[in-house]
Amino acid sequence: MKLNLQKPLVIFDLETTGLDLVKDRIIQISYIKVYPDGKETRGNEIINPEKPISADITALTGFSNEDVKDKPTFKNIASKLNEEFKGCDFAGFNSNHFDIPLLAEEFLRAGI
């Protein structure tokens, strides 16, 4: 199916330390960026959330504190993601109620 896009579309999903938009942090962001000409690029970042990952979240996401200890923080990759996402529309499961607001919070904390 060909999409009729006016600007790039980022379809993305987050794994996080919980469901609190203010207190919780991103552990992983995976995305596909679809351009109006049909070209696609993909990205996947595992992120050190700078807070402990609970056993419940490890069971849910598969990510442990050990997995993220040497990964970059969101602040370390925020500029790169900002450039990648600039001018794009966004889509994803439950993205308007959770993923987009949490991503916006992370960008604000990073000073972007």
Where are these regions (language model features)?
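Conserved non-catalytic scaffold segment of RNase H-like nuclease domains
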Residues: 1-112
